[in-house]
């Protein structure tokens, strides 16, 4: 019986380690998301949904389509935020410490091992920053289906952001997919 349990454990190890590898091995991701921001007590503070695009090394597109219409586009070291309801556009430079969690999730494995401790369990991997002053204290990545990922982030205040990412398979992204749309305000 022990031998069977050990064999099952050893067979499960590569699958567990592969969860993060499958995520970081991609050059990019695109699809739909749902996002919930939760208080430390678990109360839902905000919910939104929309579409996203991620492309290595520094391209990020996060378009909230419900309940509002907002867009965040990061290209290299620049971040542009557009809020159509408020008719506001904000552009600013990003430092390396301000990069989104997706920057880390698309980083090479060696970079992750330098910046985080990794704990793989089942179909999930928890990344804990080695730097105790990091804004996000924990990132959990779980594969819930072939094209369904859950990413949960815990910040310094104890709030968590729970993201469900439904990815489109076999979509090739290029930097031109991350152009900021022109607005008339």
Give the residues covered by each predicted segment:
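Short, well-ordered turn and helix-capping elements at secondary-structure junctions
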Residues: 35-39, 56-58, 66-68, 129-131, ...
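Gly/Pro-enriched, hydrophobic low-complexity segments
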Residues: 114-185
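Positively charged n-region of N-terminal signal peptides that target proteins for export
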Residues: 1-3
